[in-house]
Amino acid sequence: MPIIAAKPMTAATDAGLPVTKMVLVSAVALIDRDGRVLLAQRPEGKAMAGLWEFPGGKIESGETPEAALIRELHEELGIDTAASCLAPLSFASHSYAATQTHPAFHLLMMLYVCRRWQGRP
């Protein structure tokens, strides 16, 4: 089978948008015993306020995606879980154009599933 050379990836992705910053995020689909999935609504004052999303947040320097989720779930929802309860599910990669209030960036999000945690979100 012949090998086909692909164009190398550059900072200009998707629709050719220049990317100034890469944002690494981890998020989780929390699924309870009844099969319900918890979604969070983005707060006023943040980009894309009012939209719904999976809980999670930015991965800090030196932090694994799992550690970021454990930290974010504790900070945002007051629940605790372990890395062994986080199952990788998928990822998303998307470029966002600059707006009047935010510079262009590329989001790379790792998505996990979690069915076991302590506390009530």
Regions found by a protein language model. Name each.
Residues V23, D32, S90-P121:
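Active-site-adjacent beta-strand/loop module that shapes the phosphate/pyrophosphate-binding cleft
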Residues V37, A49, L86, H106-L111:
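Structural motif
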Residues I31, I59-E63, A67, H102, ...:
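Short, solvent-exposed loop/helix junctions and linker helices
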